[in-house]
Amino acid sequence: MNPFEKLNLFLSSIRILKNWYIFPLVYFRLIKKPYVIFLTRDNLQIKIILDKSNYWFQVFVEQFLQEPYSENNFKIRDNPIIIDVGTNVGFFSLLMSKKYPNASIYSFEPNPDNYNFLIEHIKNNQQKNIHPYNYAVSSKNGKVTLYISIENFTGHSLYAKTENKIQVQSITLDTIFNDNKIEKCDMLKLDCEGAEYEILMNSDESLKKIENISLEYHDLNLQNFSLDDIIKKLKNF
């Protein structure tokens, strides 16, 4: 990151955070506590675990300051339905919950540890419009294997195989729509470490009801699908 980018980052932290003065201390790893709480100007409390990897801080910067899943170019109702697949610890869901207080947000996170932090964030911020589920989303309903990344709490995957793995419950996108009687989804956000391919390629009924999709695609599961497959698929809806 060049000096101009760093300056812009620090200025963004002042714009976003009430306790912005903590931000550079975390950036330069000058705080020797297990965690800090960032307080946003719209009154969100965001817990950041401080460890050697610094991944929590990096994800906070990405979600709150860089906003890769920004819906600014989308037309979204004041009372939208938003589905967050790969919620992690809830940063995106919290952002949308504050921005759209009348929204219904369905948040899916398969990793139990991340899910517990998601629940903590929801409770601490009293966000009653976030509906959390300790589920993976894939092309099947039932048990699936989730491979655990020891180094990166955002890297747990159905496809990036590691020695550490657990069985988790999975649900399809079509089942999510049917169970919750969703007739229109204003935004689907996908960050699911390779599962985005099988989700989108096997959800024809749901895709008809989705207005906007914001996704991160990964170089995983490429033996079965490619980014071109997703693009061709979505052009039909």
Give the ranges of each region predicted by the language model.
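Phosphate/nucleotide-binding beta-alpha loop and adjacent structural elements of enzyme active sites
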Residues: 1-237
